[in-house]
């Protein structure tokens, strides 16, 4: 088949004309989907290897999610005024999250519509807590991490540093730079530098720390080093700094656990944020926090948080992911990916591989080659049964995050196609070198 086809080209043209300029790059348009397989408006098929940056962890057209949506629609309640009176499904979801998450107990939950909103709520909780404690002028600083990503709304732009020239620089009044501290992410390579920078800080002036765990996603799937992380935790904890853990891309089974940071039994966040896969494709965000950090009445609220459809689906997602974890399915995906990707270690187009659970990155020599690999993957369906839906991460990496429900056969096909795409890229690059 031709890619992009006639219908796809028409929609892409209309998008350029009528939709705002955002981050859209892919030419793969989803007309229908089934687990890991996407079909576009022209009938081309693709294997999804990034799940909408970790949203569709249970794949597309998941029967459990479809059934949950249908069951809620049959009640006639699509919107409940959860800001005005409790919605039973939102309370059930909150109870489950509060009871099982690693946040210090007792804990509470605030539901919203996205990861950015979840992180905004986390920031507001910390600031309100310091305000009521009479510490707003004493603890006014915040620790963030280089190459981090916390969302695109104004309040969390200070913590979003993965591509500041486009994410932050146009919004010149976006944060108080003097009160934002940027540390290297706690990897083994950064351990000594991180210790040095921590020793130079007046930690008594710091309100909060926001960190993605167990790895940075948008930065290029950068796993934290546990020893370095534990040192950071100990030093900042003893200084009274509030810990916000962002498990938005890493959570809901992606690294083999529900909350991502529960890989570290010694870590007890004050606040934990979730979104993406929690909603099974529907908008949702969750901010789980120590109960004593709670707002005073009226200090924070929203219109659509605790939506009954999203809440019912989230309960279903949590149950399904628990089953996948218990069955060893996610571990098998991790082992299969490790085994196949290890064979690429000497490939001329591969500079590095890293990951955890079902969340991996392959780093290429530069951004141009990475972007060309994405195009090659999309175009493979013209000669193969499937093309590949790939997504970049960081400056020059590809993230590989298949659905946690992907069949062994489809995963094998996808990894075979990925190797073929790398080989095509290698051949193109060699030909370019010869011609120049």
Question: Which ranges hold each PLM region?
Answer:
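Conserved N-terminal phosphate-binding loop of PLP-dependent enzymes in the Aspartate aminotransferase
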Residues: 1-436
């Amino acid at each position: 088949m031709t890619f992009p086809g006639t219908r796809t080209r028409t929609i892409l043209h209309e998008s350029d004309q009528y939709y705002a300029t955002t981050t859209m790059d892919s030419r793969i348009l989803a007309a229908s989907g089934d687990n890991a397989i996407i079909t576009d408006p022209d009938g081309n098929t693709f294997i999804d290897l990034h799940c909408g940056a970790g949203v569709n962890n249970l794949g597309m057209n998941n029967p459990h999610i479809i059934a949950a949506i249908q069951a809620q629609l049959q009640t006639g309640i699509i919107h409940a005024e959860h800001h005005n009176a409790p919605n039973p499904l939102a309370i059930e979801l909150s109870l489950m999250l509060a009871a099982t998450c690693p946040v210090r107990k007792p804990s509470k939950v605030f539901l919203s519509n996205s990861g950015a909103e979840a992180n905004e709520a986390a920031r507001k909780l910390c600031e309100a807590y310091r305000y009521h404690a009479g510490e707003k002028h004493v603890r006014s600083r915040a620790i963030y991490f280089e190459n981090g990503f916390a969302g695109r709304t104004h309040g969390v732009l200070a913590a979003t540093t993965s591509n500041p020239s486009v994410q932050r620089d146009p919004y010149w009044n976006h944060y108080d730079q003097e009160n934002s501290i940027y540390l290297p992410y706690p990897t083994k390579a950064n351990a000594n530098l991180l210790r040095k920078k921590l020793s130079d800080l007046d930690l008594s002036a710091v309100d909060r720390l926001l960190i993605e765990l167990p790895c940075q996603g948008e930065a290029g799937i950068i796993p934290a080093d546990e020893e370095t992380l534990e040192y950071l935790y100990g030093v900042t904890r003893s200084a009274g700094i509030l810990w916000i853990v962002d498990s938005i891309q890493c959570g809901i089974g992606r690294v083999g656990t529900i909350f991502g940071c529960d890989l570290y039994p010694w870590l007890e966040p004050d606040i934990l944020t979730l979104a993406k896969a929690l909603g099974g494709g529907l908008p949702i965000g969750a901010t789980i926090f120590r109960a004593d950090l709670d707002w005073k009445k009226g200090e924070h609220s929203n219109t659509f948080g605790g939506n009954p459809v999203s809440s019912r689906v989230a309960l279903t997602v949590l149950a399904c992911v628990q089953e996948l974890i218990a069955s060893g399915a996610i571990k098998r995906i991790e082992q299969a990916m490790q085994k196949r990707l290890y064979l690429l270690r000497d490939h001329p187009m591969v500079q590095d591989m890293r990951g955890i659970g079902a969340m991996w990155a392959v780093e290429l020599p530069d951004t141009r080659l990475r972007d060309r690999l994405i195009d090659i993957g999309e175009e493979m369906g013209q000669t193969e049964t499937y093309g590949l839906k790939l997504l970049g991460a960081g400056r020059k990496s590809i993230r590989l995050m298949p659905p946690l429900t992907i069949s062994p056969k489809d995963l094998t096909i996808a990894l075979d196609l990925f190797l073929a795409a790398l080989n095509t890229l290698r051949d193109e690059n060699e030909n370019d070198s010869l011609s120049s």
